[in-house]
């Protein structure tokens, strides 16, 4: 019997259309720079923003924290905007960080059904999320707006815990917040083999790879989940609840 279940956030609880938040950031920076009489070609901004993601991905794999502030400052440097007035630079950084607040992010299909089934079975529910360019405060806001935040007893966001999956410390943090069940009595649902599946399996949890939004392709040295789940409506039965 499972005592606790944790969920990844991106492409497991919520999803965005490909490039959606990237486009919102670019649009915001374009408006700010135009108003400051410092227009920058769109393609140059795209290249700089994509470079910030490359740096993030390197840090993520090395388990080094890399925040949206770091990324925004890198983009400023890539665009050679060092001489901007402080208030304009601050506006750019703020837009980069907070653009997700008003974004139309959507819960993954049937995730509400899965959360209710777990709650009805007496299972404690948590989140283990690797935060990218959108801070955890904003991610919680989307859960709240869609009426899902109350389903969770605890959350472990990397920008608050200070480490990314598959580091066992973030799994330890999550289970400690859920009453410290044995890992064998807990399951983790997520889409990525390297972080979600490998991290959960190495920690002794049941790993469920969710494919309803993104089906992470096989890669050498990366494990498969104990279960593969396409529809959240089937989660409770998959776990035998």
Locate the predicted segments by residue.
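N-terminal helical cap/lid subdomain that shapes the substrate entry/recognition surface
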Residues: 1-121
